[in-house]
């Protein structure tokens, strides 16, 4: 299974992005639990999940910075 592409994360809207981040965090928790109980079979899933989480959080941060840098127009300035 190839690593997910960041373009896929950029296509998500804000709500879907938050849901995906939470899902990735839950998946990491599950993987850690399986590792602790010696039930983990696919160790490569750690890498894939961490990679996906990093991509999602990067996209989220890009959007935050973009929103901050966008000039806000107040009714007084119009």
From Swiss-Prot:
InterPro entries: Ribosomal_protein_uL29, Ribosomal_uL29, Ribosomal_uL29_CS, Ribosomal_uL29_sf
Any one annotated GO CC term: cytosolic large ribosomal subunit
Gene Ontology terms for molecular function: structural constituent of ribosome
Family stated for the protein in its record: Belongs to the universal ribosomal protein uL29 family.
Organism whose genome encodes this protein: Rippkaea orientalis (strain PCC 8801 / RF-1) (Cyanothece sp. (strain PCC 8801))
Keyword Hydrolase found: no
HAMAP family: Ribosomal_uL29
Taxonomy, superkingdom: Bacteria
Protein name listed in UniProt: Large ribosomal subunit protein uL29
Key words, A-Z: Ribonucleoprotein, Ribosomal protein
CDD domains: Ribosomal_L29_HIP
A Pfam family per the record: Ribosomal_L29
Nucleus found in the keyword field: no
Gene of this entry: rpmC
One example of a Gene Ontology biological process annotation: translation
């Amino acid at each position: 299974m190839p690593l997910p592409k960041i373009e896929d994360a950029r296509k998500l809207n804000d709500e879907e992005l938050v849901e995906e981040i939470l899902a990735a965090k839950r998946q990491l928790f599950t993987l850690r639990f399986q590792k602790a109980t010696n039930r983990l079979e696919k160790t490569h899933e750690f890498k894939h999940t961490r990679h996906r989480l990093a991509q999602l959080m990067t996209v989220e941060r890009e959007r935050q910075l973009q929103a901050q840098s966008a000039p806000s127009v107040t009714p007084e300035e119009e």
